[in-house]
Amino acid sequence: MDIRQVTETIAMIEEQNFDIRTITMGISLLDCIDPNINRAAEKIYQKITTKAANLVAVGDEIAAELGIPIVNKRVSVTPISLIGAATDATDYVVLAKALDKAAKEIGVDFIGGFSALVQKGYQKGDEILINSIPRALAETDKVCSSVNIGSTKSGINMTAVADMGRIIKETANLSDMGVAKLVVFANAVEDNPFMAGAFHGVGEADVIINVGVSGPGVVKRALEKVRGQSFDVVAETVKKTAFKITRIGQLVGQMASERLGVEFGIVDLSLAPTPAVGDSVARVLEEMGLETVGTHGTTAALALLNDQVKKGGVMACNQVGGLSGAFIPVSEDEGMIAAVQNGSLNLEKLEAMTAICSVGLDMIAIPEDTPAETIAAMIADEAAIGVINMKTTAVRIIPKGKEGDMIEFGGLLGTAPVMRVNGASSVDFISRGGQIPAPIHSFKN
């Protein structure tokens, strides 16, 4: 390695906000199933605090050793609806509290997996878990929740979509931060290291380490050096930069898995922004030549960015997964916030961008008087994009305040301007319930 590569790496960390966004330990709770919910809660607490006892210490040790910030240490677990279904309990808040207690004991930032997978219908535990979400998130600090309501193979469970519109409203009424920790998915993945949508899939190993990286500032700085050059050069620049970022993510993941004595899972090839200046995906798109994100050309710029991040990342790491693409959460990206405030970015353009990016309508504040059916219809639209295009889409929406207000979340969650929502009703559409069938191109066998 020559001195230029060393100085490049130092600059990435010190000047361009490069960091490892998260080391996430996935833990299977299938061996914690018990017909008594209190015994199940105790088993869950014991397993998490045993398996992840050293997660934070090892993360801090690696960060100090490599000189690379590791912002979050997190845990994801088996969807709790599967664990709770074995009990006779009528709500699963006690299991959420066990997760929260364990997370606080081991010192992690968040714990994900208060989740249900209902893309083709409800089982016993699913409906109970979904109805437990508002209280579970109001009465815990670190628990994150997700519900998968559709998939390319199964279609969209519109009954669950309607229920989640109501649940989001109830969650917002019960707590200020609960809705920021609740995601509704289509095509959810089993190895996602990012919150709030992480859960540990039943097909995963007993315990694994997944890593999520963050480096939009690094990509922007690289693109500054090729201003005015063709898209061929832009694409190659993004690809090479993504390679460097992912290589470091793989190194950190392998070191963590070796020291913790668990399997290494994947590196998520996502560009995850923060509210800090210089750490914005929106500013990367603007560096390609857009006056402001949201104008015409934004979706094309995002397509190039997303694809080249994947291409560079796949070359750098043989185990990739998670969501893997560019994140466009409004409240967590200062460039996105600015674009909403200046009027160039609206919900409709964000929806178009979600056909490209790795998530969906993420950390978007809408007026608190938005009907539950309208929120459900937003979820249905996002699910349709994901199901038809065979990709993950999601909704993490915040019904707070009135249009034009600024909602302050603090920390990595940032600040969200309350956006205008189409006022026409979707009530009759959402009230139909039932299942939107899987698309014809999903029929592969």
Swiss-Prot record:
CDD domains xref list: RNR_PFL_like_DUF711 (cd08025)
Signal peptide, first to last residue: none
Sections of the chain in a coiled coil: none
Top-level taxon of the source organism: Bacteria
PANTHER family: UPF0210 PROTEIN MJ1665 (PTHR37560:SF1), UPF0210 PROTEIN SPR0218 (PTHR37560)
Family: Belongs to the UPF0210 family.
The protein's assembly and partners: Homodimer.
Name of the protein in its database record: UPF0210 protein SPH_0352
Organism: Streptococcus pneumoniae (strain Hungary19A-6)
